[in-house]
Design a protein with these regions (language model features):
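Charged DNA-binding/catalytic regions of mobile-element recombinases
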Residues: 1-159
Length: 159
């Protein structure tokens, strides 16, 4: 696992319902470390996502977690969780989406390869396909910059 992670939130609108996806992505290999899908973009969404990610790493790893300046990333509880785990917080400059381009790129791929290519019969169908997509993205989707390996294969080969 790398020492730089990024996070952000993106919105999906389907069947008159909004869903919000919040992933943590490892910049080392592009792997989605953890994620949370919610009907509301609230603090619990990002703290649950953090707890899932924290279960995969030891304390004090000298990790940096980068985000935009969204309200949830400025919340004291979120910042306290990072500090207690020994993770340094990094935030984009105000109004500069390019600072979080890696997260935005993942969202673009996700929407291009899943959302815009499939017909969904229900919100539940979309949710199921989203979980499958992230599993496929991590374990099967090859990347040229990873020598033709998937993110998980690249991490395992490097270990």
């Amino acid at each position: 696992m790398g020492n730089k992670w990024v996070t952000d939130v993106t919105e999906f609108a389907l069947f008159g319902i909004k869903l919000y996806l919040s992933p943590i992505i490892d910049l080392y290999n592009g792997e989605v470390i953890s994620y949370n899908l919610s009907r509301h973009p609230n603090l619990n969404q990002v703290t649950d996502m953090l707890e899932k990610a924290f279960s995969k790493i030891p304390d004090n790893t000298n990790l940096i977690l980068h985000s935009d300046q969204g309200w949830q990333y400025q919340h004291k509880h979120y910042q306290k969780m990072l500090k207690e785990k020994g993770i340094r917080q990094s935030m984009s400059r105000k109004g500069n989406c390019l600072d979080n381009a890696c997260a935005e790129n993942f969202f673009s791929l996700l929407k291009t390869e899943l959302l815009y290519l499939q017909e969904f019969t229900s919100v539940e169908h979309f949710i199921s396909e989203l979980h499958e997509y992230i599993e496929w993205y991590n374990n099967k989707r090859i990347k040229l910059k990873l020598n033709g390996l998937s993110p998980v294969e690249f991490r395992q080969e490097a270990a």
